[in-house]
Regions:
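Catalytic-core regions of core metabolic enzymes
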Residues: 1-316, 321, 328-330, 336-743
């Protein structure tokens, strides 16, 4: 089922006007009864047909013995029946021409395994062009169209708003809908196993709803990866951020996902590549997700960075300290200890605090997250100084707590002054917002004053959610002002907000240079068997990744001839195809400055490791990096760049992208490496050509596109990076049966 037919079926399901409930029940607490209750709560008032051969009537309503008794096809068949009855009922619905179905049950088949029944249900629905939510789901609430097709009692009414939710987890679905966050929903789907209709379909539908400003995903696996990738790019092009919580990135997590849903979980490289390619925001837990959704859902964005940093207003001095790392925030503190500053790089945050210790806490956490505070200008400093009591420093993050007099004026004025600074991308009132026993409303009113005085993002950042005054938080949220619940989760949300920018270029739109015959030439050679070391370097050179002069040798005489060709000093390496890590077996000898040294080294290596060698010119010194191509079972070939050398596995410092890559995307991957400062020659080290490294990443991405169907994995380690460019010193290529990229 593809194209308009698929989209039409999804729309018929999520906007259903006629619904059949198979398994309707009058028994209180039963699934069939709860489903009826929820459908009756639907503001759209759909026509609902009850089906259950056990009953003639349920309450005042007629109950039919069979789905076949309904005269006309319906938009949605809700199957509130046991797994044993699912196939029969879905076949009946498909034969009648019903448009869609929800399968709430898990669709397990005793004695047959998990795949059999689910595969047959999938085939039935696809053959009939039906949309299908589930199996193993809680259903959906189409808030924008007033439809509640869920079998569990959820908040009524569910507040309308900017968030479209799709989750593989039913428990997370219920928890998010019940969270007292005033998030507001346009659509909420518990999609379960996604036998037919998948996350990509729901995203595409949600993008067509006027109210959707952000999409929230909880994903156990990638289903229909190509369709999901396209949907995520459409979301980015529409300026609708996608926030995803992914699970199953560890071996234990993958096993649990498989046990839970039978799904192959994407590992961390899969998710990282997806985020790198589409701009999808990845969060680590539900706390980070809800803070991020609330902040982005408020609808305000940090302006384009004319200068670095954002500034926070703190009510304590200790929460304020930070230096530069990229775009940042601003905070106001009410105590001096919370304030230690870090310098600006791009937009930053600003924060205002009323406690010194909590300001320091915020600063420490922000620093650990690479979230910078804005470097505010002299005009802002002067405005702040005029508001503060004597002895308080006018800096960002800001501790405003002196005598406590005129708290509303000082807090609101500080927040507003920081928001007006060009270097500030977002402002946080970083206070605990506890219940004020004396009825004081200074914090509430100051936050609202600041929100109304600027168009920049303003939020309240509470450090201890359990102490948060829920009534005060509700008032602020009703005014549109986000209240972030937790130091780390709130600061991460601010970092995500500041990361929003121009959408990445979809891989399909990246134009690779045309090299007629290149792919055919290498496919033919690779089909003949493994490459020699010099051939592997030639392959890389064909894709713009140079290497030193190199020649293969199968005897001492050939080695000496090769050395004469490349010039002394030379490097001698074993070229046995079964040895992956040459240095581990003593298979590399460097600094051979003449024929005698080379002959002796050759004889020694040949005696231990066999006669096949490669003789290479000695490369100039540089920083050792690594490049790679891996074939992901879900996304196809992926490109990896990271720290190289003998510590590559230990350091595990790498970034992953989906080919083909633009130069901008490749530079971004390099910039995000922890080892990136080393390339600038720290402590007198060698300064590497970062542009050449990024160009090598781009070249490898073109190789991955052209040859990713025959190469299972490719490692370039080390890739020597110096001031004159890069040189690939070794390459390991694993071949496999030809495969096209998964769709």
């Amino acid at each position: 089922m593809t194209g308009p037919t698929r989209a039409d079926a999804v729309r018929a399901m999520l906007e259903a006007r006629t619904i059949a409930v198979v398994g309707a029940s009058p028994r209180p607490g039963s699934f069939g009864a709860r489903l009826l209750t929820e459908l009756e709560r639907s503001p759209s008032r759909p026509t609902v047909h009850l089906v259950n051969p056990r009953y003639d009537r349920i309450g005042a309503r007629v109950c039919l013995p069979s789905l076949g008794e309904i005269p006309d096809p319906v938009d949605l068949v809700a199957l509130a029946v046991g797994d044993h009855a699912l196939e029969e009922q879905l076949v009946l619905a498909a034969g009648r021409g019903d448009r869609s179905s929800v399968i709430y049950g898990s669709a397990f088949e005793n004695g047959v395994g998990r795949g059999g029944l689910r595969a047959r249900l999938t085939s039935v629905a696809n053959g009939a062009g039906m949309a299908l939510c589930g199996a193993g789901c809680m259903g959906f609430v189409s808030v924008a169209h007033g439809l509640r097709a869920i079998g569990y009692v959820e908040p009524d009414p569910l507040p309308a708003g900017p968030v479209a939710l799709v989750t593989h987890s039913g428990s997370a679905f219920s928890a998010l809908l019940r969270a007292d966050r005033r998030l507001g929903w346009s659509l909420a789907v518990s999609s379960g196993q996604e036998l037919v209709t998948t996350t990509a379909d729901y995203i595409d539908y949600a993008l067509g709803l006027d109210g959707t400003r952000v999409v929230a995903l909880l994903l156990e696996t990638l289903r229909r990866p190509a369709a999901l990738l396209a949907a995520l790019h459409r979301a980015a092009a529409a300026d609708v951020p996608v926030v995803a919580l992914t699970v199953g990135g560890t071996p234990g997590g993958r096993a649990m996902v498989a046990a839970h849903s039978g799904a192959l979980a994407g590992d961390d490289a899969t998710w990282e590549a997806l985020c790198e390619s589409t701009g999808m925001i990845r969060v680590a837990d539900l706390a980070e997700m809800t803070d991020t959704l609330e902040l982005i859902g408020a609808g305000r964005r940090a302006p384009a960075p004319p200068a670095p940093g954002i500034s926070p207003v703190h009510d304590s001095g200790a929460e304020r300290a930070l230096g530069p790392v990229g775009r940042g925030i601003a905070s106001v503190h009410d105590s001096g200890a919370e304030r230690n500053a870090i310098g600006p790089v791009g937009r930053g945050i600003a924060s205002v605090h009323d406690s010194g210790a909590e300001r320091a806490l915020v600063v420490d956490v922000a620093h650990s997250l690479d979230l910078p505070f804005a470097d505010i200008g002299p005009e802002t400093t002067a405005r702040l100084a005029a508001l503060l009591d004597d002895g308080l420093d006018a800096t960002n993050p800001l501790d405003v707590w002196g005598t406590g007099a005129s708290a509303r004026t000082v807090l609101a004025g500080s927040l507003t002054a920081l928001a007006a600074d060009p270097s500030v991308g977002a402002v946080a009132l970083a206070v605990d917002l506890v219940h004020e026993l004396d009825g004081d409303r200074s914090y509430i009113e100051a936050a609202i004053d600041a929100w109304d005085a600027t168009t920049k993002p303003v939020c309240v950042l509470a450090n201890l959610p359990s102490a948060l005054d829920r009534t005060a938080a509700r008032e602020l949220r009703d005014h549109g002002l986000p209240v972030l619940e937790g130091t780390r989760s709130g600061l991460l949300a601010l970092r995500h907000l500041l990361s929003l920018g121009a959408p990445p270029t979809p891989p399909a739109e990246v134009v690779a240079p045309e090299m007629p015959g290149r792919r055919a030439r290498w496919v033919t050679r690779l089909a003949a068997g493994p490459l020699r070391a010099d051939e592997a370097l030639a392959l890389l050179a064909d894709y713009g990744i140079p290497g030193p002069a190199a020649h293969s040798a199968g005897s001492r005489a050939e080695a000496l001839t090769a050395a004469d060709a490349v010039g002394y000093p030379v490097v001698l390496k074993t070229d046995r195809p079964d040895i992956s890590h040459k240095s581990d077996v003593g298979g590399v000898v460097v600094g051979l400055d003449g024929p005698e040294a080379l002959a002796a080294a050759y004889d020694e290596l040949a005696g231990r490791l066999g006669p096949d060698m490669v003789v290479m010119a000695t490369a100039p010194p540089g920083v050792e990096m690594a490049l790679g191509v891996v074939r992901d079972p879900l996304l196809g070939p992926l490109v990896v760049v990271g720290a190289g050398g003998v510590l590559v596995e230990l350091l595990a410092d790498r970034r992953v992208g989906m080919p083909p890559l633009t130069a901008t995307a490749a530079r971004r991957m390099v910039q995000r490496l922890a080892v990136r400062p080393v390339l600038d020659g720290i402590r007198g080290g060698i300064v590497a050509d970062v542009g050449a490294l990024a160009a090598a990443v781009v070249g490898l991405s073109h190789l991955a596109v052209e040859l990713g169907d025959v190469i299972v994995a490719l490692d370039v380690n080390p890739l020597r990076c110096g001031p004159g460019g890069v040189l690939a010193l070794d390459a390991l290529i694993e071949l496999g049966p030809s495969q096209s990229r998964p769709g």
